[in-house]
Amino acid sequence: MTTGQQLAAGVAALGLALPADATQKLLAYLALLDKWNRVYNLTAVRDAGRMVSHHLLDSLAAVPHFRGETVLDVGSGGGLPGIPLAIARPDLQVTLIDSVAKKTAFLLQAKAELGLANLSVVTGRVEDYRPAARFDVVTSRAFSDLREFVTLTRHLVKSGGRWLAMKGLYPHEELALLPQGVKVSADYELHVPGLEAHRHLIVLEPVE
């Protein structure tokens, strides 16, 4: 099975209706990630088939749970989940932030080559980031534990906004250590085609 066939089968299994050019852009992104990864070590996953399941489909599995108009992907690294999200949901304005300049250089190159007008890239530490407007959703795939995640980004979630944290096993201990003023509003167990590991999407909300 080619990576294109694997991606198409995975998208169908997830029940996603993607824009007409999404599959082509997702595969082009994967090729870029593979190319840059040889120099910049953006991901430990190097096999093309595993990159489809562990990166593309893992990110796409969370797509239906994003509401609102603006999203911040914290510690975006190689652009996960932000770039697949921006490709799958052109209605969203997605901002990627990472403190490592070589990673944001890759993200800017991907934005340009893929023609993602709804994508912005910021180099810097998230705790120092002061955008003109706060975000409907702040998300992360591999940034930190939940307590640190919400503490460092609380100033970036707008009133009525949410955090969406992508996790492996259900994070019982991390949830027990959440700071005051934050509540768990939902937990979605994600079933990712080709990925046998446990995946949870934890939805958190600030308590006004």
Swiss-Prot record:
<dbReference type="InterPro" id="IPR003682">
    <property type="entry name" value="rRNA_ssu_MeTfrase_G"/>
</dbReference>
<dbReference type="Pfam" id="PF02527">
    <property type="entry name" value="GidB"/>
</dbReference>
<keyword id="KW-0963">Cytoplasm</keyword>
<dbReference type="GO" id="GO:0005829">
    <property type="term" value="C:cytosol"/>
</dbReference>
<dbReference type="InterPro" id="IPR029063">
    <property type="entry name" value="SAM-dependent_MTases_sf"/>
</dbReference>
<protein>
    <recommendedName>
        <fullName>Ribosomal RNA small subunit methyltransferase G</fullName>
        <ecNumber>2.1.1.170</ecNumber>
    </recommendedName>
</protein>
<feature type="binding site">
    <location>
        <begin position="126"/>
        <end position="127"/>
    </location>
    <ligand>
        <name>S-adenosyl-L-methionine</name>
    </ligand>
</feature>
<comment type="function">
    <text>Specifically methylates the N7 position of guanine in position 527 of 16S rRNA.</text>
</comment>
<feature type="binding site">
    <location>
        <position position="75"/>
    </location>
    <ligand>
        <name>S-adenosyl-L-methionine</name>
    </ligand>
</feature>
<keyword id="KW-0698">rRNA processing</keyword>
<feature type="binding site">
    <location>
        <position position="80"/>
    </location>
    <ligand>
        <name>S-adenosyl-L-methionine</name>
    </ligand>
</feature>
<comment type="similarity">
    <text>Belongs to the methyltransferase superfamily. RNA methyltransferase RsmG family.</text>
</comment>
<dbReference type="GO" id="GO:0070043">
    <property type="term" value="F:rRNA (guanine-N7-)-methyltransferase activity"/>
</dbReference>
<keyword id="KW-0489">Methyltransferase</keyword>
<keyword id="KW-0949">S-adenosyl-L-methionine</keyword>
<keyword id="KW-0808">Transferase</keyword>
<feature type="binding site">
    <location>
        <position position="141"/>
    </location>
    <ligand>
        <name>S-adenosyl-L-methionine</name>
    </ligand>
</feature>
